[in-house]
């Protein structure tokens, strides 16, 4: 069975009630390729608004959640709370969480494991900085981040990996389709050697570095690219074209 193409839109800390309602209208009108799974990462205050205004065919994700069900963790939200709001997905380990908020590989792995245990689906992000790429450490960094998650996760059926070359996020720089495919293929090989051939064949690996309507089709044609995690472009009507990159 082929891997179902999965496109995530990460709205980050953007939007208000009016603009999110507008985005929901764009997504509802589409048309969206029925063979592509679509997930939008919405700011926490607007999760219920987005869920209420989007068709069931579009999934809604939180952009973060904590590693325990409840307690004295001011400002955090738990997977149980997201489930209570009918939110089925969460984005974890995004490069901005790692860089700006200091989240470690281990914390992210704990969050992923807990979210899965609570019944959420997870987009787990990994990727290297420009310094790391220029030092030839791309694979070492991606494998280290993936191994941290693999040490805590046994069932991968509800995990999508998002490879984000950090140097290509919001910079207008893009990995070439060949560069992206090379890392995706290396990650799949890592899963074969360190998890299992079955997981390697089934797991979806999204590409997440400055994806636009202009470059999405060429990227989508690569054999190991199973979707995208889209930042800025997910706030614009061109997101529809990115969702439909395989049509």
Curated annotation (Swiss-Prot):
Gene3D superfamilies: Aldolase class I (3.20.20.70). The active site is at residues 94, 164. One of its GO terms (molecular function) is triose-phosphate isomerase activity. One of its GO terms (biological process) is glycerol catabolic process. GO terms for cellular component: cytosol. It catalyses: D-glyceraldehyde 3-phosphate = dihydroxyacetone phosphate. Substrate binds at residues 10, 12. InterPro entries: Aldolase_TIM, TIM_sf, TrioseP_Isoase_bac/euk, Triosephosphate_isomerase, Triosephosphate_isomerase_AS. Pfam families: TIM. The keyword Isomerase applies. Keywords: Gluconeogenesis, Glycolysis, Isomerase. It is an enzyme of class 5 (isomerase). Its EC number is 5.3.1.1. Pathway: Carbohydrate biosynthesis; gluconeogenesis; Carbohydrate degradation; glycolysis; D-glyceraldehyde 3-phosphate from glycerone phosphate: step 1/1. Homodimer. Belongs to the triosephosphate isomerase family. HAMAP family: TIM_B. This is Triosephosphate isomerase. The lineage of its organism: Eukaryota, Metazoa, Ecdysozoa, Arthropoda, Hexapoda. The gene is Tpi.
């Amino acid at each position: 069975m082929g891997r179902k193409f999965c496109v995530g839109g990460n709205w980050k800390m953007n939007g208000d009630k009016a603009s999110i309602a507008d985005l929901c209208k764009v997504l509802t009108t589409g048309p969206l390729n029925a063979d592509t799974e679509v997930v939008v990462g919405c700011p926490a205050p607007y999760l219920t608004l987005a869920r209420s205004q989007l068709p069931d065919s579009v999934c809604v994700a939180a952009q973060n959640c904590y590693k325990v069900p409840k307690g004295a963790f001011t400002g955090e939200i738990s997977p149980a709370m997201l489930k209570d709001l009918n939110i089925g997905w969460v984005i974890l380990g995004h490069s901005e969480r790692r860089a700006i908020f200091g989240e470690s590989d281990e914390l992210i792995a704990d969050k992923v494991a807990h979210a899965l245990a609570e019944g959420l689906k997870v987009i787990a992000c990994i990727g290297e900085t420009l310094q790391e790429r220029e030092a030839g450490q791309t694979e070492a960094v991606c494998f280290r981040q993936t191994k941290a998650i693999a040490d805590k996760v046994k069932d991968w059926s509800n995990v999508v990996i998002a490879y984000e070359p950090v140097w290509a996020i919001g910079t207008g720089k893009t990995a070439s389709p060949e560069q992206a495919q090379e890392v995706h293929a290396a990650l799949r090989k890592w899963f074969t050697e360190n998890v299992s051939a079955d997981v390697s064949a089934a797991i979806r690996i999204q590409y997440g570095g400055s994806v636009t309507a202009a470059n999405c089709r060429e990227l989508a044609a690569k054999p190991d690219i199973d979707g995208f995690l889209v930042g800025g472009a997910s706030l614009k009507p061109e997101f529809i074209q990115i969702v439909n990159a395989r049509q």
